[in-house]
Amino acid sequence: MAEYCAAVPQTSSAELSGLLRRYYQDSGVRKRMCEFLGGTDLKHATALYIAGTDGYSDYQVQSPPTDLIEYLEGALEVDRSLWDTQSLIADIDLEYHNFDYPAAPWRDPARAFQLQQPVLDATLQILGKAGIAPLTLVSGRGFHLVWAVLRKSGAFRHLARLGRVPASLKSRNAQACAPNGASVDPDLACAFSGLGLIMEFVGHLVLEASMERCLLPVQPAAIEVGPGIYGREIISLDLSEYGDSLHTRHVRIPFSAYLKPRQFEWMFGESEVRRLLPIFEIPLSDMAPAQAITAMRDPDAVLEIAQHVSAAIPDQSEAMEELLDNYEHSELAIFHDQFYMQLREGTSLPNCSIPTPPCAQFLLEKPNDWLLKPAALQHIVRVLTAIGWSPSSIAHRICASYSKDCDWGNTWDRLEPCSRAIFYTRLFAGMIATGLDKLIDFNCVSHQEKGYCMIPDCSSNLILYRDMLLGKRKST
């Protein structure tokens, strides 16, 4: 694997903090951050909150946007909430994952970004056909494509009509969810749910368009695969943010430092982390990705970009209408309607003569933290669909596992179990129903390679379950 950072001098933690404090004093950087927060100044920002981290953990403190200067003086990485007072913020998260060598995209960014190019091209082409021109941000492992739908627009009302919010999430949204004590408006929660359906539709189109052109598996979340020469690596068009509550999700602010390598200091050492940083989040603008991955590691180059490249989130309300129309005439929309109809009507567990294989039963009985992982949820949906469970029954079964007393800690303070079970069941069952899931890795060897086979000596053979699914597909 190429050593992109081999010639980069090491920067100590104290030196990096000093560099970031000086960098953050730049008026151009602060101006662009305010743009992304939705205002000309921090007092008029439309983002509900910002969140900062020193990079060493996932923990982030939420504060009002007016606290931005304090965060910058602390040399932090800074995010903004997807939750906004004026708009529904859409975000597509595209990135390279290597489950065996997490440092791979930082040590050899040229390779990681080149591998993503077919997926980025497909995403921009599909959005472009609908007239959507997002703000494209370059991050440490990939891209964020961000745009806004004004809450006063017809597209927002259309999304709100499409959205389905479970009663448990409605109750959660009614509580104080922001630093200022605000709760999530019901219409906004419905629109965010509707946006999740549209993003799932976009995901289907992108995966279908790019899977033959991309050298790596393209997944709708961080789903492990079998190993290749460079380890278990994928390109993820990550839809997982639409399975969580709106108030919990945020996106890194352009021109913020990118400090995620610090999370892995325990794995590859302090000296390696020093070699990898600094990295900054920047708009792609008119640069090629190869230019961007060089510029984002050079503070002076980033400061120059901040002088002339806007970070305002573009309003794409009108263009969203065409994407909505395309979705409503799709096979996926039909599946979604049937899925939610089953959920409303209620469902009983099927009488199955075919046993659930031990690997799936293990995941259901040990949900913490197995059923917090997308690959495990995909496996459950595949197996139970094969033996005759309806998608709504599967969602109820996963939710029942989430309800077990399994030392969850504060997990369900941050996440909402019912909506999470519904989202991942819908996502993976929809891929089966439309034929997007080719089931190539639905076998015992692949399951072992992914790291999810906890009972290797069982007598079950997942090929039999895959054949059942393929048989169902041929008969429909």
Write out the residue ranges for each language-model feature.
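Secondary-structure capping and boundary motifs in well-ordered enzyme cores
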Residues: 82-88, 115, 138, 369-373
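Long, well-ordered alpha-helical scaffolding segments within enzyme catalytic domains
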Residues: 111-131, 192-206
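Short, conserved phosphate-binding/catalytic loop or strand-edge motifs used
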Residues: 139-147
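Short, hydrophobic/amphipathic alpha-helical patches that form generic packing surfaces
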Residues: 73, 200, 252-255, 375-387
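Short beta-strand
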Residues: 133-139, 243
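Basic, alpha-helical nucleic-acid-binding regions used in initiation and control of genome expression
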Residues: 189-193, 274, 279, 283-284, ...
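DNA replication initiation on ssDNA origins
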Residues: 1-112, 151-194, 211, 215-266, ...
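Long alpha-helical, hydrophobic tracts
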Residues: 124-127, 138, 151
